Amino acid sequence: MPIPDMSSQYPHQQEDMSQEEEPRGRKPQSMVDQEKQDYLDFIVPRLQITGKILQLTEEVIQEQANYISRYIDFLNKYINYQRKVSTLRFERATLIKYVKKLRFLNDFLYTYNADVNMITEPLQKLVRPLGSFFIRYLEIIDLLNYYLTQSLRNETISKTLNQDLVLSQECIAMADKTYRVYVKFVQWFIESSSSVTTGDLTMEIVQFTRKCAVEDGIDLGETDDVLLQEVQLVTSSEEFEDLLEKWQQVLHFQCADLDDTFNDNIRHWSELFDKKKEK
């Protein structure tokens, strides 16, 4: 099945910015502050954990675990091929360290069980600890992606004098796309039910992307960059349920695409070393 049209499923997109009279489609700060306070006073107290939210959250957590597992499987196979090249022993040791870290984080996701006693509790009681953990593992994925596509790539080419044992451009692009999709989900998961995000619930990549966009004079109301699109606040537990279910589907299909691309790269390496054996 194809990945759903995700642009229509991001719950934070501002639908019609053309009606705003303020420059760059922004409301006066005083109005924004009042809207946030009204949301905290009147909407947040009504956002409660439901049985369906717990069920969907477990399904979404499984998608996070699947995402990490795709990397673990891919890295293990990559490491096996690196063993065939003695000059890459230090790079191989670094990847092994990443695998151990990802396995440790994944253990939490695989053993997570939603507490049914949380039903009717405030939604933030579920969102905040999970959101913080999601950010934690995504920061590791971010560092890993940089290592795979920059440092490791350059060192491998330098030491082997060819590009046979590096990630393909298609693989790099898919890894980046998938990472951004998962980041956007976590941003939505955290921000859709609270107008205040601080401390361990802030996402570096989102803040950095916004900062660069502002410095470059990009209209945040018109951009196609998913990380710059605003998160719309939900107004009921039922709305949160509906959007969470859609996100689960988006994550599922995106992770499947990543798995296919990783496998394509592995097949390329397999064919490469099989040919060398024949010689």
From Swiss-Prot:
In alphabetical order, the GO MF annotations are: lipid binding; sequence-specific mRNA binding
Q: Where is this region: Disordered?
A: 1-31
Enumerate the Gene Ontology biological process terms.
intracellular mRNA localization; mating type switching; mRNA transport
Name the GO cellular-component terms. cellular bud tip; cytoplasm; nucleus
Superkingdom classification of source:
Eukaryota
The protein's matches in InterPro entries, at most eight in alphabetical order, are given as: RNA-bd_She2, She2_dom_sf
Sorted alphabetically, which keywords does the UniProt record give?
A: Cytoplasm, mRNA transport, Nucleus, RNA-binding, Transport
Function comment: RNA-binding protein that binds specific mRNAs including the ASH1 mRNA, coding for a repressor of the HO endonuclease. Part of the mRNA localization machinery that restricts accumulation of certain proteins to the bud and in the daughter cell.
* Name recorded for this polypeptide: SWI5-dependent HO expression protein 2
Task: Write down the species.
Answer: Eremothecium gossypii (strain ATCC 10895 / CBS 109.51 / FGSC 9923 / NRRL Y-1056) (Yeast)
| Source species taxonomy | Eukaryota, Fungi, Dikarya, Ascomycota, Saccharomycotina
